[in-house]
Amino acid sequence: LVPFLGRTLGGLLARL
């Protein structure tokens, strides 16, 4: 999996 997807998911979770 590309790190971009993981980073996006992490950002979204952090936003919550």
Curated annotation (Swiss-Prot):
Superkingdom of origin: Eukaryota
One BP annotation, GO: innate immune response
Residue numbers carrying Leucine amide: 16
CC annotations in GO: extracellular region
Main location, first listed in the record: secreted
Tissues expressing this chain: Expressed by the skin glands.
Secreted listed as a keyword: yes
Annotated localization: Secreted
Keywords: Amidation, Amphibian defense peptide, Antibiotic, Antimicrobial, Immunity, Innate immunity, Secreted
Free-text function comment from the UniProt entry: Antimicrobial peptide.
Family the UniProt entry places it in: Belongs to the frog skin active peptide (FSAP) family. Temporin subfamily.
Protein name according to UniProt: Temporin-1Tr
